[in-house]
Amino acid sequence: GYGSINSLSQVLLKMTLPGVPDFYQGCELWDFSLVDPDNRRPVDFDSRRSILRHMKKEEGQRGHRESLWRERKKGWIKLYLIWKTLEIRRKFKCVFDEGEYLPLRVAGRQKNSIIAFMRKYDSCWIMAAVPRLLTGFMHEGLAPAQAEWGDTFILLASAALPSSPNAIAIGTHSFP
């Protein structure tokens, strides 16, 4: 529900905003432990490797991401988001190491429910957007894409867009 969405939003922000993302070992899945000494328990890395192998095998299969959302209580969806975002960070290292941060404006009825920005380095651009404050217009259990966004949209100023006619979207990562 809402907690899952908030957690995933925080993960994506942590991994795409300026700075170095920091993860506690073992927090790649949902972690409901409290503070010290609970967070000092041994981490089951074999389990995480096994889950990641399974997700890599299933990647691209029809309905894979939808099943991650449906079964989000397992926590695999968080590991999936970390894995895919780390792939993007590796592929576009210069953007995250040296790139600019450009906040984007959002307009429309639910404008306060989206945080959006671009990261830019030279001719390379990455855009990130996450939902927030969903309880007022989205039913518990739905995925953000199923919310009633109405006329809400992200404003892309012409100065913030690539000028090259060869600029293409490399892909989107969203959940149902």
Where are these regions (language model features)?
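Carbohydrate-interacting/catalytic domains
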Residues: 1-176
